[in-house]
């Protein structure tokens, strides 16, 4: 069975841990304030003939700053060289999410974007065209 390393990256409170829990069946604590995921969390799941090792990186707004969370996220991506990065974008604060997403794309690793918090965005009157965003970023 093939095994690949995948990381979830995104700003605090964008739903990374919820996605991680859904995919891995883990029960990582999810709270509604920044800094909950200070350390990376790991789990796995099987998709077809592939075992996906999934790592939930600490929430961060940028890879350029020097907070412990930002350093841990950048260091993990550089040193562990994941097969793919899942950039979890908060649709309700898309501009902030895109800043980190663009930095992740600059690292030249296979990356895909997941729009999360669409319900929150809709309640705020925010509409996101996922297809146009995907085309603009050049990633699925």
Which residues are covered by each model-predicted region?
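Conserved C-terminal guanine-recognition region of P-loop GTPase G domains, centered on the G4
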Residues: 43-49, 72-140
């Amino acid at each position: 069975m093939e095994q690949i390393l995948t990381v979830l990256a995104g700003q605090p409170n964008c739903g990374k841990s919820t996605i991680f829990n859904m995919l891995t069946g883990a029960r990582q604590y999810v709270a509604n304030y920044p800094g909950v995921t200070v350390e990376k969390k790991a789990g796995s799941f099987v998709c077809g003939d592939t075992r996906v090792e999934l790592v939930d990186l600490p929430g961060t707004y940028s890879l350029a700053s020097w907070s412990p969370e930002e350093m841990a996220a950048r260091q993990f991506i550089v040193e562990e060289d994941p097969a793919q990065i899942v950039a979890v974008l908060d649709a309700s604060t898309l501009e902030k999410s895109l800043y980190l997403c663009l930095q992740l794309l600059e690292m030249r690793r296979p990356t895909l974007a997941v729009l999360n918090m669409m319900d929150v965005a809709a309640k705020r009157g925010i509409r996101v065209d996922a297809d146009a965003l995907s085309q603009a970023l050049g990633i699925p």
